[in-house]
Amino acid sequence: MQCSRVLGIEGTAWSLSAAIVGWDKVYAEASHPYVPETGGIHPMAAAQHHASHVSQIVRQVLDSGYDFDGVAFSRGPGLGPCLRTVATAARALALAYDVPLMGVNHCVAHIEVGRWQTGCHDPVVLYVSGANSQVIAFRRGRYRVFGETLDIGIGNALDKFGRHLGLQHPGGPKIEALAREGKNYIHLPYVVKGMDLSYSGMMSAAKEAAAKYLKEDVCFSLQENAFAMLVEVTERALAHTGKNEVLIGGGVGANMRLQSMLDTMCRDRGAKFYAPPRKFFGDNGSMIAYTGLLQLKYDQTIPVEDSAVNPIYRTDEVEIPWL
């Protein structure tokens, strides 16, 4: 169908964000992230935060004055209480404005906003966020997962190690800063099994190392190890698929060291590396709205009564008719 703009709401975990997006640009956006006082994300507390602030951020984008042809929301994967909160808001908006409703896969949204912002066409995607570490590529109508973590996602691993060091959430950016000051590599477990990888053993070893070595050196070693594993499986996916583009997405993708390692690998293989602008790495309403725009164009809408959230929604469950 013909459509020009969609309002999207993101709220899978700590980020709460809304945006109105068209084919050409982001027309309006607002956010109000949940920041825990201590520790990591508490699902019920995050959901309470989202419930308290979702009307505020939606009102901010509505006050921009731009109309929209549909409403999209993050259907999953994510924290159930948070997903249900934003889904309720999206249903209410769709009914109030009498427009179609689209339930968006959060992982697919990271891919699509990256493709939109960089202009790449058919890349191997390294998707690295809190709970996810996946190597993905399009094949036979879907984004197929070629490899992934067998235990903990890279973002959660970094955040947990950050808390072990006494760093405030989120730990990833603070570990990146400390790693730039590190000079000595400390041996840590390196676990790649075919196309899959594992971080739990490496994290345990890093915690033990933190009691013996400078935290800057441990952060440096942790990053080098963890990112080398990701680059290895991404390079293997490039060889297997024969593609010549690599796109990075997800919050951890903003790490400049990881981007540098991927860019070097791509140059060595004659491939091109793509990274979207920094604002699109973290969870954001714009990626939900843009993917909702694609789904609306291809009639992937859902009735309100069938719009239940899915906390374990897999990337490869989604049909992709636009590629």
From Swiss-Prot:
Reaction equation(s) it catalyzes: L-threonylcarbamoyladenylate + adenosine(37) in tRNA = N(6)-L-threonylcarbamoyladenosine(37) in tRNA + AMP + H(+)
State the InterPro entries in the record: ATPase_NBD, Gcp-like_dom, KAE1/TsaD, Kae1_archaea_euk, Peptidase_M22_CS
This protein's cofactor list reads: Fe(2+)
The family note in this entry says:
Belongs to the KAE1 / TsaD family.
Tell me which UniProt keywords the record has, alphabetically. Acyltransferase, Cytoplasm, Iron, Metal-binding, Transferase, tRNA processing
Subcellular location per the Swiss-Prot or TrEMBL entry: Cytoplasm
Tell me the cofactor note.
Answer: Binds 1 Fe(2+) ion per subunit.
Provide the primary localization. Answer: cytoplasm
Biological function = Required for the formation of a threonylcarbamoyl group on adenosine at position 37 (t(6)A37) in tRNAs that read codons beginning with adenine. Is a component of the KEOPS complex that is probably involved in the transfer of the threonylcarbamoyl moiety of threonylcarbamoyl-AMP (TC-AMP) to the N6 group of A37. Kae1 likely plays a direct catalytic role in this reaction, but requires other protein(s) of the complex to fulfill this activity.
Q: What is the protein named?
A: tRNA N6-adenosine threonylcarbamoyltransferase
